[in-house]
Amino acid sequence: MVSYLFVLGALASVAIASPVPELKARASCTFTDAASAIKGKASCTTIVLNNIAVPAGTTLDMTGLKSGTHVSFSGKTTFGYKEWEGPLISFSGSNVVIDGASGHSIDCQGSRWWDSKGGNGGKTKPKFFYAHSLKDSTIRGLHTLNTPVQAFSINGAANLGVYDVSVDNSAGDSAGGHNTDAFDVGSSTGVYISGADVKNQDDCLAVNSGTNITFTGGTCSGGHGLSIGSVGGRKDNVVKSVSITNSKIINSDNGVRIKTVAGATGPVSDITYSGITLSNIAKYGIVIEQDYENGSPTGKPTSGVPISGLTLSKISGSVSSSATPVYILCASCTNWKWSGVSVTGGKKSSKCTGIPSGSGAAC
């Protein structure tokens, strides 16, 4: 169902002979079901999605919104169960604001799909949220629970700000959650993610391609860390000017991670990690490797995706006793600058190779 409130506004002319401007209606709409929201979105510039129960196999399709539209999630948003690829929610448009009202939640109830296989088999699981072709837009304060697999897919976006978003998949730690990436960024420019709070079982952030990407003030727990890549093997394989700062990585497999695809091409350049705190990292505190093939390392780095202009500063914390503090496997790595890097615990690697001389980097 939907309710409309039309607000009429006009500009008055001060000149006696000037014509009266045309009145334009702008609608504020509250939707309580997905079908009405999808059908009525084009008539509204303020949209409230109130306690929406999205039917199984349906995308809550908020694509093609009018410029300047404000969409707010209110109450509890849920989704019916079906094995399909999704997405559960999709947005596109320019100058769009997407936010959550106080006390709202978007609960995917992912345990219905979780089987410890993620996107690698088992049940077909829907991705959660496509932020595709969002331009000059903002996502703020969304509270997301239990995504079946990946949460936010940011692709083809430009000048997108993502503020104070939480992704809580902590229930998946013991219930088979897998491949529950929080933010996957591809083919985008000017993406700014601030204040994210993530509990999941995969990358907190994965930048696969894009320029001018920032992640700052985040907390990442339970997953695979803050990642560049894997880079290579896609249509767009350029990663440039990425800044990851002032964030915490807790109880995760990895901390800082950069991985490129063996035999592929495409540059990774001007990457900064600064002010990163690590705690109880299970596998690698810092891992940089150019040897990924079919999603797994081969131990044989290739040079087709060079990593240049990598700055690490003020990276501190600890790894578990069985973990590796720093692991670097490079075939083409240049112009690095590391300072204030102190990762303690674990066992040092004796297999590092290709570290740029004079960079300050060490295993």
Swiss-Prot record:
Carbohydrate-modified residues: 212
Prodomain residues: 18-26
Active site positions, chain numbering: 202 (proton donor), 224
Gene3D superfamilies the UniProt entry points to: Single-stranded right-handed beta-helix, Pectin lyase-like
InterPro entries xref list: Glyco_hydro_28, Glycosyl_hydrlase_28, PbH1, Pectin_lyas_fold, Pectin_lyase_fold/virulence
Top-rank taxon: Eukaryota
Top EC class for this record: hydrolase
Reactions that this protein is recorded to catalyse: (1,4-alpha-D-galacturonosyl)n+m + H2O = (1,4-alpha-D-galacturonosyl)n + (1,4-alpha-D-galacturonosyl)m
GO molecular function per UniProt: polygalacturonase activity
Keywords: Cell wall biogenesis/degradation, Disulfide bond, Glycoprotein, Glycosidase, Hydrolase, Repeat, Secreted, Signal, Zymogen
EC assignment: 3.2.1.15
Subcellular location: Secreted
Cytoplasm recorded as keyword: no
A GO BP annotation: cell wall organization
Disulphide-bonded residues: 29-44, 204-220, 330-333, 352-363
Signal peptide limits: 1-17
Predominant location category: secreted
Any one annotated GO CC term: extracellular region
Family per similarity comment: Belongs to the glycosyl hydrolase 28 family.
PANTHER family attached to this UniProt entry: POLYGALACTURONASE
Described function: Involved in maceration and soft-rotting of plant tissue. Hydrolyzes the 1,4-alpha glycosidic bonds of de-esterified pectate in the smooth region of the plant cell wall.
Protein name per the record: Endopolygalacturonase 1
Source organism: Colletotrichum lindemuthianum (Bean anthracnose fungus)
Encoding gene per record: PG1
